[in-house]
Design a protein with these regions (language model features):
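Rossmann-like NAD(P) dinucleotide-binding subdomain of oxidoreductase/dehydrogenase enzymes
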Residues: 125-267, 396
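Short, well-ordered beta-strand elements within core beta-sheets of diverse protein domains
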Residues: 34-41, 55-62, 148, 257-260, ...
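Residue-level signal for inorganic ion chemistry
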Residues: 32, 68, 90, 113, ...
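ALDH superfamily catalytic-core signature
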Residues: 231-376, 439, 486-490
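Conserved C-terminal structural/oligomerization subdomain of aldehyde/semialdehyde dehydrogenase
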Residues: 31-37, 221, 258, 312, ...
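Long amphipathic alpha-helix in the N-terminal Rossmann-like dinucleotide-binding domain
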Residues: 51, 73-84, 98-123
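Hydrophobic face of amphipathic alpha-helices that form TPR/SEL1-like repeat modules
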Residues: 1-30, 354
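N-terminal alpha-helical segment of soluble enzymes
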Residues: 13, 27-94, 295
Length: 491
């Protein structure tokens, strides 16, 4: 398969241009080259997508779990069959290395569809005989039409995280990928458009300031689901609250990656890199606040600098590349601006800290793997989300000081602990105000493990069957077993 010159909207089972014919350019962030044009949806297009989803939902909600499971598994099979193509498109459109898209993004997306197929085949309602007179039946029913908006950092995987529960629950969706990275999702729907019920999933591409706003405020939606910044997530929550509909939100983070002096050094260095260099640091749960025990600090920093200095940055399509391009030059400039902010605050650059322009990377948006040292937890670089390959290193003396600093953050999405003392690891994990804690690893995201945040990092948990509670509504049916009148109004 080759990329199309122009991609339309996918509404009501058909591909079509935006009503006004407007398009946006999709570019390769690694070299600035034009990839394709994508439709820039109008408000009328969004209205059509919602109407199509409503009509589809009214039919799809009556399907059996077996039928929905078969559809989910079929989508997973198609993803696996075309994983090389989809991985290449993802790398070209996003800038992340092909070794990540081929081994993580695409296969994990397929796994997600299969996971929910298995979940719904095993799920059951409940019945409770309250006493000899009453029977209570509890059912879960589809919530309806869901508006879903995902970011540019994991476009394909985030699509799976959002769409698999929609299908599993019996809902319908109006789905908006980021205008920066729509191509992998559009390519997937070129592959599955014929197997989907008409109007079940509608893909609306375009600017977040336009189509994203129209989805956010549309009165025809029964639920909103969003992954992205905390600032926009707050707006989504307010919009949902005004209409008294639920919203699930997976938002920003400034996660702590903790290294005790008894940590295995090789394991710790691996976890450090997984935490802040994976996907060029453009990960909501990136281990960007690096807490190192004082007695381990010098040894750890010396080894970390050597590791960061040898990271292969370059062409995302080269299988040997370990770190690719940031999403665009604006993002790269923002990351480097934070490095300057850190320096002004008193931090020192131990390694990196500049744009990477060697080996033909001057046309892209590459940033060197970076560590800032001599950082204190009150600095902006320790409190604000940089969203790039920049780790800030903070010393700690003991557990009490550590936990106080770790929890001194508006966020609570992820965190990591590296130690050979499992009792200490569990004790610290229980003390951390965060939704996910990795022990002696980082950034593992398997289906079946709930992912989501405390505090300003969001509402709800994804990648686990618990999310189906957010995509369904509970119905209780109460049955009288006596066959007699109550006598409450006897004359």
């Amino acid at each position: 398969m080759k990329l199309l010159e122009k991609y339309g909207l996918f509404i009501n089972g058909e591909w079509r241009d935006a009503k006004d014919g407007a398009t946006l350019d999709a570019k390769n962030p690694a070299n600035g080259e034009h990839l394709a044009k994508i439709a820039d949806a109008t408000e009328e297009d969004v209205n059509d997508a919602v109407s199509a989803a409503r009509e589809a939902f009214n039919k799809f909600k009556h399907t059996t779990v077996s039928e929905r499971a078969k559809l989910l598994n079929k989508i997973a099979d198609i993803i696996d069959e075309h994983k090389e193509h989809l991985a290449k498109v993802e790398s070209m459109d996003n800038g992340k290395p092909i070794r990540e898209t081929l081994n993580v993004d695409i296969p994990f997306a397929a796994e997600h569809f299969r996971y929910f197929a298995g979940v719904i085949m095993g799920e059951e309602g409940s019945a409770n005989v309250l006493d000899e007179k009453q029977l209570s039946i509890v059912l879960r029913e589809p919530i309806g039409v869901v508006g879903q908006i995902v970011p540019w950092n994991f476009p394909f995987l985030m699509a799976a995280w959002k769409l698999a529960p929609v299908i599993a629950a019996g809902d319908a969706s109006v789905f908006k990928p980021s205008s920066e990275t729509s191509l992998s999702v559009l390519e997937l729907f070129r592959l599955i458009d014929k197997i989907l019920p008409k109007g079940l999933i509608n893909i609306v591409t375009g600017r977040g300031s336009k189509s994203g706003e129209w989805i956010k405020n549309h009165p025809g939606l029964d639920k909103l689901a969003f992954t992205g910044s905390t600032e926009i997530g707050r707006d989504i929550a307010i919009a949902a609250a005004r209409r008294i509909i639920p919203a699930t939100l997976e938002l920003g983070g400034k996660s702590a990656n903790i290294f005790f002096s008894d940590a295995n050094l090789d394991k710790a260095l691996d976890g450090l890199q997984l935490g802040i260099l994976f996907n060029q640091g453009q990960v909501c749960c990136a281990g960007s606040r690096i807490f190192v025990e004082e007695s381990f600090y010098e040894k750890f920093i010396e080894a970390a600098v050597k590791k960061f200095s040898t990271i292969k940055v370059g062409d995302p399509l080269d299988p040997k590349t370990q770190m690719g391009s940031q999403i665009n030059k604006k993002q790269a400039e923002q990351i480097l601006n934070y490095v300057e902010i850190g320096k002004k605050e008193g931090a020192k650059v131990a390694v990196g800290g500049k744009a990477y322009t060697a080996n033909g990377c001057d046309k892209g948006a590459f940033v060197e793997p970076t560590l800032l040292v001599d950082v204190t937890n009150d600095m902006r670089v320790a409190q604000e989300e940089i969203f790039g390959p920049v780790g800030v290193v903070i010393k700690f003396k003991d557990e009490a000081e550590l936990i106080k600093m770790v929890n001194d953050s508006e966020y609570g999405l992820g965190g990591g602990i590296f130690t050979q003392d499992i009792t200490k690891a569990l004790r610290v994990a229980r003390s951390m105000e965060t939704g996910r804690v990795w022990i002696n690893t980082y950034n593992q995201i398997p289906a079946g493990s709930p992912f989501g945040g405390y505090k300003n990092s969001g509402i709800g948990r994804e990648t686990h069957k618990i999310i189906l509670e957010h995509y369904t509504q509970m119905k209780n049916i109460m049955i009288d077993l006596t066959g007699k009148v109550s006598g409450f109004y006897a004359q």
